Amino acid sequence: MMYVSLVHWLALAVALAVPFVTALGNVPYPQDDPFYYPSENGWQNEAPGTILRERKIQAASLGIFEWKLDAWQVLYRTAGARPDKPSYTVTTFLVPSHAHRDRVVTISSPENSNFIQCAPSYAFRKTGVLEIANFEPRWEQMLYTLFLAEGWIVNAPDHEGPESAFSAGRFGGHMVLDSMRAANNFKPLQLSSNPMHIGHGYSGGSTPNGWAASLHESYANELNVVGWSLGGSMTDPLYTLNSLDGKPTSSLVVAGAIGLMDAYRDEVGNLLDDEVWTEEGKIAEKVMRNSCVYESVIRYFGATFQSERYIKGGRNLSSWPQMRKISNMNTMGHNPRFTPRKPIFMFHALYDEEINWHQANKTAVEWCNNGANVRFLTYSSTSLVHVTTYLLNLPYIVQYMRDRFNGKDWYGGACQFDVESQNPALDVNVLGERFRGILEAALDMLGKEIGPNDSILKNRLKAGQNPNTHHKTKLHVLKKGDISPGEGGDHTKESKKAAAKFKAEKKHGKHH
């Protein structure tokens, strides 16, 4: 049975019912805006994170609802798929009232497209007209006030860069890390001399965020990163694209293939046009390059792309050696050299209908085998799917970030794998409280001052208190020290069974 998340169904319904609108003159699209491109030659010689352009903006949601905070956008020098390949992109800084100048949360919003018009930075602009197109980053931006309410400065990079290279993780990882450098370099933010950074990304945002975590040590180890949060994680590009084919969001198969090839075009040339696509496939590529994710999903809802209609010979994308090579290079955990060295919180629904749980779990296990510090939380309820898992984990994410900024221990530097079988949505009180907080967040964007003294989660997210008070994993019984995959810390049947299985295998020498 195929599932489509409720939020996605609603988004599709809105997209079909409301005509797409365009910016009316005062805010040009990125492809028409000189700000998105370096003004002079020589930018390639600047250090990564160097500011090339800057501007103050009026931030807004859906193009019309103003955010009452300070907001800037900067164009900065970064790197492409390889660290020695100069590139550039834009990031957006959001500064709440009474901001903590030593705490920055970098959020990689899902873009999931091959069209620069879908960039998160454009979605932040007040255009003066209702903007329904490019809904993917816009719905997540409504959740940013959960972080702004804490007094944290938010940094939101266009991690797909000028190529709009969706699914190219290393590419996005460089851009995320360099956005942190840009934040440190941007004087109007008035950051402390060594500010703390946390990276966060869910779904399509997990890819650049996870790779930023992986590349931090080798590419930008001067950054004071204190933690990473990622969920619904797309850690293996081809695995994800294969699993999506024929499903409601199958247009991502084409978008992902395009993104991977664009990031490495100097190595693979025009592989897709020359060897892969049929005429129908070329039409699909053109659609992807001129539409945002929900438009392409509507156009190709449920299509099977790895078929003779779209691909020559009906071959699987993984049958091309170039595709396999690039996908392996962009698979988290594949190379032990790129193992994150800062605390990580990962969470994933076992029955995620969009991004398969197994790839994320495999990455967590491989990272742990190479010395990472990870908590991997699995939700085993069949009623939790891709988007709802994110929404219901927001309090966990906020608490995790608080703990990281406050320097609290994270499982003794080891790994912890837990299973949560209870669905918080089954408890009406939890559902009501959580979504009340989210609705308050939305209301705060419609006119209230955004900062640590506003109404968001004021009663529910009190300092030092875990906000998940119903059916939560029992944090006080989580073990410390060296904990291997499968050894859970809660009292659910799944966790006990996994721990017993692991101990039995360890006794017989299957684990070392």
Curated annotation (Swiss-Prot):
Any single GO BP term: lipid catabolic process
Organism whose genome encodes this protein: Malassezia restricta (Seborrheic dermatitis infection agent)
Variation of activity with pH: Optimum pH is 7.0-8.0.
Main location group: secreted
Active site, per annotation: 203, 352, 386
SUPFAM superfamilies: alpha/beta-Hydrolases
Name of this chain's protein: Secreted triacylglycerol lipase LIP5
Segments of this protein annotated with the region Disordered: 480-512
GO MF term set: triacylglycerol lipase activity
Pfam families per the UniProt record, alphabetical: LIP
Superkingdom of origin organism: Eukaryota
Membership in a protein family: Belongs to the AB hydrolase superfamily. Lipase family. Class Lip subfamily.
GO cellular component assignments: extracellular region
Glycosylated residues in this chain: 316, 361, 453
Compositionally skewed regions (Basic and acidic residues) per UniProt: 488-497
Keyword Transferase on entry: no
Protein role: Secreted lipase that hydrolyzes acylglycerol lipids such as triacylglycerols and consequently releases free fatty acid. Can hydrolyze 4-nitrophenyl palmitate to release 4-nitrophenol and palmitoic acid. Due to an absence of fatty acid synthase genes in Malassezia species, secretory lipases are essential for the yeast to generate free fatty acids from degradation of sebum and assimilate them as lipid sources for growth. Plays an essential role at the pathogen-host interface during disease progression.
Catalysed reaction, written as an equation: a triacylglycerol + H2O = a diacylglycerol + a fatty acid + H(+); a monoacylglycerol + H2O = glycerol + a fatty acid + H(+); a diacylglycerol + H2O = a monoacylglycerol + a fatty acid + H(+)
